[in-house]
Amino acid sequence: MPGVQGVVPPQYIRSMTPETQALVRSATASAAVPFVPEVTLRTAAEPFGLWDRTERDAPPFWAFPWAGGQGLARYVLDHPETVAGRRVLDVASGSGLVAIAAAKAGARTVLATDIDEHALAAITLNAAANGAPQVSPRRLDLAAADHGDAEVILAADVFYQRDLAAMALVFLKAARRAGAAVLAADPARAFVPTAELAPVMTYEIPVLQVLEDTAVKTVTIYSLP
């Protein structure tokens, strides 16, 4: 297959269909992530054209490196002890950026979860391109509140909508009670449950101005006590 060094290894094929991978390939090109240049992602050059192409489906969040994901990926790579040798679950993985960073930081396994089949295809292609065989794309319904045997939960950019933020917090708190470490990242969106989270550090992240109405976002990395 073109675009991933000619071949997608067998462990990635299960999360792709011809239709979803064709759309991801045709709508994106590989590019280094601005704040995480160790990772390349299939990224859309023209956001609104892709939004129009996928208007019958979930929004194409998988086609862009969002601010929270860039921040959490940077944190994990700079602090590999948070994931090294551990089973990791990445919530609402989108492009797979955070999951790939966790794999590069030495995670034992990484479940990169999303509900959008195009996101799962993007994760598949991006993980293969970055040589991250620990990453396994999976569907995950947050309402099920089942984090499996994950020892670390990573969640970036999940607090942008009221109902989703509430559901995500329930999921994260359940995982924390079960003993998993939880790290989240967000650029101060309206529904971040700051009263429940402990700030760890902040980053100034370059973002697409056409999507965020600014060229830089301040992202906070949080832990869940």
Put a short name on every predicted segment:
Residues 4-225:
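S-adenosylmethionine-dependent methyltransferases
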